[in-house]
Amino acid sequence: MIAYVESSGLAMMALRQAGHLELQTRLLAFDEQVCQAVGIIELSSAAARWIRRTQPTPQYAQSVRESIEEIWRTTTKHAIDDAQIQRAAGLCERYQLRAYDALHLAAAESLMRIVSSKHMRWFGFDEMQNKAAVAIGLRDGMVD
C-alpha cells in the first residue's frame, strides 16, 4: 500500500504538531510514503516559519531540521510532469485551491492511475484540498 502524504502532513510530523502521532501510527501500515518532489520546499518553508515564530532552543531547532532530513530521505519523490502541471491548473480553478495544494492532488491522482485507489491512500490536512481529493477519487487515509 502507498501513502501519498502532502507536505503539511510531513510538516506535522517534523514539527511534532497536534495529530502527528496518529499520522505516524497510520503510516506504519503502508509500504511506501510518497510526496510530490516540490514538497521539500513547502516542508522547509513551514519549518523555517515555525522556527522564526516560536524561537525554540538551538538544539530543538536542529532536531527539527534533522527530522525534516530524515522524513524527506525516507519519502519517495513523485516527479512533476507537464500533465500534472496542466491538471493542477484545472484543479486550482475548479476547487479554488492554492497552487501547491493542486499540484499535490494532481500528483496523487497520477499515482493513483498507476497503482489504483485500492492500493493507495491520501493524507492531506486542508479541508478544501481534502474535499477536492475525494471528488477526484482519492481515498482519505485518516478515515477508517
Task: Give residue ranges: language-model regions.
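Acidic, PIN/NYN-like endoribonuclease modules and their adjacent C-terminal/linker elements
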Residues: 2, 106, 110-144
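Amphipathic alpha-helical segments within well-ordered protein domains
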Residues: 8, 44, 48, 89-92, ...
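Helix-adjacent hinge/juxtasegments
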Residues: 49-81
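Short, well-structured N-terminal submotif of metal-dependent ribonuclease cores
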Residues: 1-40, 50-63, 144
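Acidic catalytic patch
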Residues: 39-40, 70-95, 102-107
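Noncatalytic, solvent-exposed loop/strand surfaces
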Residues: 14, 18-21, 49-50, 67, ...
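Short active-site oxyanion
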Residues: 1, 30-33, 74-76, 116-121
